[in-house]
């Protein structure tokens, strides 16, 4: 894979797009023994894969599920960017078959799949870095942004500090205890010109190219807003499988939840004291 793709160059030149990501995932999915079953998946996700991966791709596509409008919130899952995100997930899952549908993974399960070499890429957050270090000997990993979606204006997005990013390609490292800590440091501290600390990581971490990527990510503006309603229905939908395992068409899935989500959001905002 590394011989075919210069992933760092793709990232830094902002050519790390959904189309390129899809191509790489297809080249990263293998039936290693010819028995007709996939042994190495292109992608796994933290927690229930169809929740975390979909959310991460949505952020990367500038496709929020909600938007603040006047004194309330509008559910906008029926707009093109969000529907396009769900459609892309369907393509990766059912057409390309690069995401496993065999397990409803818990967070640890999907992480373990990646850590043990069962998937080439994993989408997750920085607080799992320490877990990775304790699970696999002699491992370091690359850090890549979630790829740029077609509605993102050609730019990477970071929803909140240390939010979802793509971790990929385990490789060997002599200093396994230090592997991956660079990501935690940069995303938590966001240094503007901390060359001394960077130099110390360069000495310890095998995959030094990730330092450039991490530093770039740490300086991106955050896109977080406060419009997502903290309601039972919204939480259930956002942390759910988005109809993907059942092959429910995106527009059909959204239509099935839109009215209830909007009604609950309207009720929540009607109780808010906006004076």
Residues of each region from the PLM?
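Aromatic-glycine-rich donor-binding/catalytic loop that engages nucleotide-sugar donors
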Residues: 1-11
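Extracytoplasmic/periplasmic solute-binding protein
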Residues: 2, 14-74
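Glycine-centered hinge/linker elements that transmit conformational signals in sensory
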Residues: 18, 22-27, 64-104
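Paired acidic/hydrophobic, glycine-rich loop segments that form the ligand-binding mouth/hinge
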Residues: 120-125, 142
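Extracytoplasmic/periplasmic substrate-recognition and gating elements
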Residues: 134-203
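Conserved C-terminal helix/tail region of periplasmic/extracytoplasmic solute-binding proteins
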Residues: 171-180, 188-275
């Amino acid at each position: 894979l590394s011989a075919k793709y210069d992933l760092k160059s793709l990232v830094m030149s902002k050519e790390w797009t959904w189309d390129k990501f899809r191509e790489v995932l297809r080249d990263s999915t293998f039936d290693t023994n010819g028995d007709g079953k996939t042994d190495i998946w292109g992608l796994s996700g933290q927690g229930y894969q169809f929740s975390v991966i979909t959310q991460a791709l949505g952020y990367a596509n500038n496709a929020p599920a909600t938007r603040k409008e006047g004194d309330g919130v509008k559910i906008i899952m029926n707009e093109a960017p969000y529907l396009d995100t769900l459609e892309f997930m369907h393509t990766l899952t059912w057409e390309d078959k690069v995401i496993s549908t065999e397990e409803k993974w818990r967070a640890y399960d999907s992480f373990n799949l990646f850590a043990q070499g069962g998937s080439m890429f994993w989408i997750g957050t920085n607080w799992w870095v320490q877990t990775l270090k304790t699970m696999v000997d002699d491992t370091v990993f690359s850090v890549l942004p979630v790829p740029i979606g077609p509605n993102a204006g050609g730019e990477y997005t970071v929803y909140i500090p240390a939010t979802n990013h793509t971790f990929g390609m385990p490789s060997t490292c002599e200093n396994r205890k230090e592997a991956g800590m660079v990501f935690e440091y940069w995303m938590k501290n966001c240094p503007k010109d901390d060359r001394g600390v960077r130099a110390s990581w360069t000495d310890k971490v095998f995959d030094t190219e990730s330092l450039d990527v991490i530093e770039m990510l740490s300086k991106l503006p955050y896109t977080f807003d406060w419009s997502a309603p903290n309601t039972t229905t919204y939480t259930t939908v956002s942390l759910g499988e988005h109809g993907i395992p059942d092959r429910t068409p995106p527009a059909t899935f959204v239509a099935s939840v839109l009215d209830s989500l909007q009604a609950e959001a309207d009720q929540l905002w009607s109780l808010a004291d906006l004076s």
